Amino acid sequence: MSDKLSYKVADISLADWGRKAIEIAENEMPGLMKMREMYSESKPLKGARIAGCLHMTLQTAVLIETLTAIGAEVQWSSCNIFSTQDHAAAAIAKTGVPVYAWKGETDEEYIWCIEQTIYFKDGKPLNMILDDGGDLTNLVHTKYPQLLKGIKGISEETTTGVHNLYKMKSSGTLQVPAINVNDSVTKSKFDNLYGCRESLIDGIKRATDVMIAGKVAVVAGYGDVGKGCAQALRAFGARVLITEIDPINALQAAMEGYEVTTMDEASKEGNIFVTTTGCADIVEGRHFENMKDDSIVCNIGHFDVELDVKWLNDNAAKKINIKPQVDRYLLKNGRHIILLAEGRLVNLGCAMGHPSFVMSNSFTNQVMAQIELWTNTDKYPVGVYFLPKKLDEAVAAAHLDKLGVKLTKLTDKQAKYLGLDKEGPFKPDHYRY
């Protein structure tokens, strides 16, 4: 362990810039600052050695410093080869937190970075996992199974990682209790929807400077992420087509006025394509061949499996790199495809990801999940769990003052009529918002 690097980032001299930007982000993240205020004295995460695998951004820097402020030891890697913000990584590394992340990692470097977070400086292994997408969870289960007994819990950030946890649970391979942070209302209905509604356009515009108004945009998937993307593209003046497998989501899209069709049909009409599904093989070779000249293709789902990038690389007559994370392919039919971020997350590959305020919702849930799993271990046998509704409401409440929201309070009579506690929870667990 003595040979282990204390950190590896692109450029440690970016730390001062990163620190200034982190201070601005803190002001937009009231939920995380509330966590520090509530728990910095009691330090409920004392003794926790958290290995984190989540986009190393300015917002994540605020999360990391919140975890350390309330007692945890933390080591970090990014969950995407393009998503690290190098000034944020440098700023955190300079504080002494081991960070292994830089923008533009190779796939091999990516795995190396994750592996650096498994053992801490004194040779002791991780005892908590904070994951985004499941790569750290899977690595520990497959390559370091001897460590699983000592791990108290996993908190998982995103839809793809949650799917992975449920697959592991059903196959009997999950060995650690996990909290599904993604499906907290204050995560999925805010980060996934409102975060993507802003950061998708940011990524497309920074990458291409394309005029969206008047274009035909195709959004694959109409879950919370797809809904946010469709709203944004429509607001900029695009005519939006939706593809869906789920009849409920398809009906929702149709009732919102979107045309719902198949990718085989939509690929002939679209100018801009966005995949949001978390599934594989959404845009395949035949779809690329159908597309108009200079169609822009990108993905905002977690992994790069939604677009058949291998087909493009194997079958295009020519590939020209326009600038980092923007490639223009000449197909054999004479038309071009513009691919963003190599088919990986466009909002983080080509822009700065979600704004700080909406990430404060998500990351406050992460902090609560880590505290819950660490301090109430006996409550959680191996399985996948949700945070209680009361905590979900507390996350939302922590963000209201920043927006100038004035909340109505129930009277005793009203609370009795509804059969509720005046302080909540206000909705049953099955309520869908």
UniProtKB/Swiss-Prot annotation:
Bound how, and how many: what does the cofactor note say?
Binds 1 NAD(+) per subunit.
Record's catalysed reaction(s): S-adenosyl-L-homocysteine + H2O = L-homocysteine + adenosine
Q: How does it assemble?
A: Homotetramer.
Has keyword Plastid? no
Coiled-coil annotated residue ranges, if any:
none
**UniProt GO BP:** one-carbon metabolic process; S-adenosylmethionine cycle
In residue numbers, the region (NAD binding) covers 184-351
**Membership in a protein family:** Belongs to the adenosylhomocysteinase family.
Q: Which UniProt keywords apply?
A: Copper, Cytoplasm, Hydrolase, NAD, One-carbon metabolism
- Per the UniProt entry, the Enzyme Commission number(s) are 3.13.2.1
Binding-site positions, substrate: 57, 132, 157, 187, 191
GO cellular component labels:
cytosol
The GO terms describing molecular function are: adenosylhomocysteinase activity; NAD binding
Q: What is this protein called?
A: Adenosylhomocysteinase B
Q: Which gene encodes it?
A: ahcy-b
Query: What is its cofactor?
Result: NAD(+)
Show the stretches that span the lipid bilayer: none
Return the InterPro entries for the record: Adenosylhomocyst_ase-like_sf, Adenosylhomocysteinase-like, Ado_hCys_hydrolase_NAD-bd, NAD(P)-bd_dom_sf, S-Ado-L-homoCys_hydrolase_CS
User: Function of this protein?
Assistant: Catalyzes the hydrolysis of S-adenosyl-L-homocysteine to form adenosine and homocysteine. Binds copper ions.
Which domain of life, per UniProt? Eukaryota
Pathway(s) annotated for this protein in UniProt? Amino-acid biosynthesis; L-homocysteine biosynthesis; L-homocysteine from S-adenosyl-L-homocysteine: step 1/1
